[in-house]
Amino acid sequence: MQKPKKDKVSYLCTECGDSFAKWYGQCPSCKAWNSLSENRFVEGPAGASAGPAEGAKLITSTVTAEPLVKTGLKQFDQILGGGVMAGAVILIGGEPGIGKSTLLLEVLRHAPGVYVTGEESLAQVHARAARLGLKENLDIVQGNSLAQIFDYVHAKKAKLVLIDSIQTTYTDQRTGFAGSPAQIREVTQRIVEFAKSNQVAFLIAGHITKDGQIAGPKLLEHAVDTVIYFEQNPTSRYRFLRAVKNRFGATGDVAIFEMTATGFREIENADSLLPVQEIGGIGSCLFPQLEGTRVMPLEIQVLVTPTGFANGRRIGENIELSRIHLIAAILE
């Protein structure tokens, strides 16, 4: 009589993604404290095999590369290396409300695909699409189950899938709630396997923590092909897309967008970011800063007042104080 299978238990570090057979207060790999969480999964039947692997020699291979999918956003395509490659898994991280969902909908304006929402209702997504002026026949589906998402993509024969978000998607192959380290790890691995085997590109939105890192184990960033961070100044309407990992292009490139009532507007000329005023007057100067392949003009403003103390006090905003001390020492 065959014994029932038992759940295997391991402990997953939410910081580095390594797993261990027992719990530690401090991760042996990355030395983070209280970062290990329980991970349960059912082991498959012994000796199970997915069949022999199929491949071809690179020199004699007749496989032709599929054309890149253009998103319609010129700067976004440039960051991705010219467009979205078939089978690529792209992770877009950013704070809540920064515009990740809007960016994914903007992609559907020019690139046909399936939009999967796990955070909002269909009515909410359609309302945003109408505000952006998108066509009505968008393929939008609400769901959180990864198996159902794969079935829908197979039925539609879609080549581009946009998931909002990775933290709300779950798989029945792992225990735990959606968004837990174990679920995020398993969902990510299965998406990557599905994307590569079916030549389907995935654009995935992800939340970030208070430290500015994408929520979930580090394996999430290691497994995907491209990691893009959505950044903003809290007092500005401008948004910055920065590639920190890219298997198909350069890293460090920056795309600049302006958030408007009808969606994102690309900023081609970075000079327009500076307000038209007395630039270069007393107490201010401009200097060019290289961001990837773009030159960004930045303004430095200095205000000096007399002091009654022996040593003056230096305060810096949006610049490290140690750098101010270094510049002051050089000038003196």
Predicted regions and their residues:
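Residues immediately C-terminal
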Residues: 168, 193, 210
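Short hinge/gating elements
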Residues: 13-17, 61-63, 94, 171-178, ...
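Conserved inter-motif catalytic segment of the P-loop NTP-binding fold
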Residues: 95-98, 102-190, 307
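Detector for small/aliphatic-rich hydrophobic stretches
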Residues: 2-9, 14, 19-90, 105, ...
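Substrate-engagement module of ASCE P-loop NTPases
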Residues: 182-203, 207, 223-234
